[in-house]
Amino acid sequence: MFSINIEETAGCVVSAKVQANPLVTQKCHKEALKTVKKNVVLPGFRKGKAPDNIIEARYATQVEQELRRFLLRASFEALSQMCDRKPLSPKAVRSSTVDSCNAADGGVVSFLYEAFPVIPSLPWEQLNLSDPEPVKEISDEDLENGLKNVAYFFATKTPVTRPSQEGDFISLSLHVSKKGDLNSNPVAIFENKYFKISEEDMTDAFKARFLNVSTGHRVEEEIASEDIQSFLNGDLLTFTVNAVIEISSPEMDDEKARQLQAESLEDLKKKLRIQLENQAKEEHHQKRFSAAEDALAQLIDFDLPQSLLQEREEILSREKLLNARLVKYCSDSELEEQKQTLLEEAKADARKAVKLLFLTQKVFSEKELSISREELQRMMDVCSRERFGAHPPKDISNEMLQELVLAARDRLTYHKAIEAISAEKKDLEVVPS
């Protein structure tokens, strides 16, 4: 019923001509007549019951439009099901044109779209996944620092009027606005966010700004970077110190340990050590997971869809530049010096991310991995909380539910594929698909 001819170019761009035989256009013609009938009323006939010949004679233009619409839809379905180079999605179609369409003779439809990439057979023997470092051993210093963090639970937090000192916490708000624009209302980037004034928690530049300042202190900074101006839709940053808070932590003892469901201070230390050991194991596992990601991404190269690369690169570029300016607190001149490096990092990270998106799908299929209903439901709950918060709406639409299912399935597919590589770093035997 259909024949398809394609031409491929770089960036996974495909041009296709879909030829439909008369059986297809005849069926589309019947659907077109049926659709037009439903929308018109003729004297002497009930709605939708007028003879076809009368409808075709009086509404030839509308019938032709519907015929082309149905042919276009049928041709895209054929392209998605029959063609080796399937479109990524309906949104991946850059253009579609009905070149010819006749109920008796058939029709031709042209498409220009981005297709799924072609991934060669994976050379597992070349997988280079090095042995990770052993799990970190918990030292007495680690345990002592952990106890200090636990002591914060009992700390006295006192707002003070004196200037801020090393070790204090400050509550900050950050707003962006347009300088000199009286109609520009400041927009919050964050409000009442707490920072500890210390070398461990602040960059030197950020710490210098907020050491020896009092409640109510304001810092205004003009943004010279056009990139940051564009991202934030403003050119003036205003930091406001809402409070300076002195923290006084007591020494831990048996009584305080019992308040934390421990029998004694020694028992609390044992439980804390177990917790720190579990954290170290999780960090070790994450390092191994990241190493597997790197190894898979480096295993093979192939052509990638340009639009996905560009979209991911734009997102990562924005994140890296904003992080440098607002988190690492680089000046505009420092940001300009680092900009090219950051953009190159974003480009490389984007390529890696898009490669892994498709490689993990291939690994999932070749390794014959599966997702249980329980796993899918748990991941859907995670995706739902990320999108809606703790209380999702009760009347979620079918479309939104489908989005959650796809998001959850994609995450699980990615995670399971990387875990499979991490668990089997040597002698991976995969049956090619």
Swiss-Prot record:
Name the family: Belongs to the FKBP-type PPIase family. Tig subfamily.
Keyword Lipid metabolism included in the entry's annotation: no
Q: List the catalysed reactions.
A: [protein]-peptidylproline (omega=180) = [protein]-peptidylproline (omega=0)
Record's protein name: Trigger factor
Q: What is its EC number?
A: 5.2.1.8
Its GO CC terms are:
cytoplasm
User: What is the annotated localization of this protein?
Assistant: Cytoplasm
In terms of domain of life, where is this protein from?
Bacteria
**What sequence ranges are listed for the domain PPIase FKBP-type?**
167-250
Can you quote the domain comment?
A: Consists of 3 domains; the N-terminus binds the ribosome, the middle domain has PPIase activity, while the C-terminus has intrinsic chaperone activity on its own.
MF term (GO), any: peptidyl-prolyl cis-trans isomerase activity
Q: Which keywords has UniProt assigned to this entry?
A: Cell cycle, Cell division, Chaperone, Cytoplasm, Isomerase, Rotamase
* Record InterPro entries: PPIase_dom_sf (IPR046357), Trig_fac (IPR005215), Trigger_fac_C (IPR008880), Trigger_fac_C_sf (IPR037041), Trigger_fac_ribosome-bd_bac (IPR008881), Trigger_fac_ribosome-bd_sf (IPR036611), Trigger_fact/SurA_dom_sf (IPR027304)
Keyword Cytoplasm, does the record have it?
Answer: yes
Kindly name one Pfam family recorded for this protein: Trigger_C
Q: What is its main location?
A: cytoplasm
What does the function comment of this entry state? Involved in protein export. Acts as a chaperone by maintaining the newly synthesized protein in an open conformation. Functions as a peptidyl-prolyl cis-trans isomerase.
